[in-house]
């Protein structure tokens, strides 16, 4: 399934496949398991990230990435880091509840009962862990991804940029978004 292929990319497919099948896949580098996604140049990172999304989500991810880069330029933050955070911010969003919880277990991510009941919130935490461990991203990018859904007090400029970019990117349609985009 698509989810199994995604979990192979996150190096967390043990519960989806027979151990001998998984060993064969990894030994032969099938389904991209032999690829190194750490510290990729941006265009390759973009390709890798978008390959993990549902096609309907791709315009949002690209819009968030471009909006984050634009906001970084406007507010004097690192544009490259903002773009990297934007392209990876929803990298685990397509995963099911069981896959999200499996990633939480793999990465030692503590979850609340509320998060387990509303598992779509977990993608920010699992996405940050994947950004760190699979893509080799720096702490600033990972932290921005971690907080892009809930926010927190005393956010860094990059964290604020990603939070806002996700909220106001061009695919978002709600009353007041156009005014927000002009600020």
Language-model region placement:
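General structural signal for secondary-structure boundaries
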Residues: 1-2, 41-42, 96, 112
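Exposed alpha-helical structural elements
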Residues: 3, 12, 20, 41-48, ...
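Divalent metal-dependent catalytic cores for phosphoryl transfer on phosphate-bearing substrates
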Residues: 47-52, 60, 69, 74-183
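Classical nucleotidyltransferase
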Residues: 1-37
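Extreme N-terminal tail/first-helix region
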Residues: 33-53
């Amino acid at each position: 399934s698509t989810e199994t292929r995604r979990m192979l990319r996150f190096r967390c497919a043990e519960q989806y496949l027979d151990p001998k099948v998984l060993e064969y896949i990894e030994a032969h580098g099938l389904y991209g398991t032999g690829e190194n996604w750490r510290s990729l140049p941006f265009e390759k990172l973009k390709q890798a990230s978008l390959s993990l999304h549902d096609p309907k989500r791709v315009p949002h991810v690209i819009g968030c990435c471009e909006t984050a880069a634009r906001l970084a330029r406007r507010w004097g933050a690192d544009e490259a880091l903002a773009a990297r955070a934007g392209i990876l911010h929803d990298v685990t969003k397509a995963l099911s509840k069981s896959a999200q919880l499996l990633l939480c277990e793999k990465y030692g991510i503590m979850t609340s009962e509320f998060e387990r009941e509303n598992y779509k919130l977990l993608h920010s935490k699992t996405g940050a862990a994947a950004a760190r461990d699979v893509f080799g991203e720096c702490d600033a990018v990972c932290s921005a991804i971690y907080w892009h859904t809930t926010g927190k007090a005393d956010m860094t400029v990059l964290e604020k940029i990603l939070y806002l970019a996700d909220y106001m990117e061009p695919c978002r349609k709600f009353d007041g978004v156009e005014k927000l985009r002009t600020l």
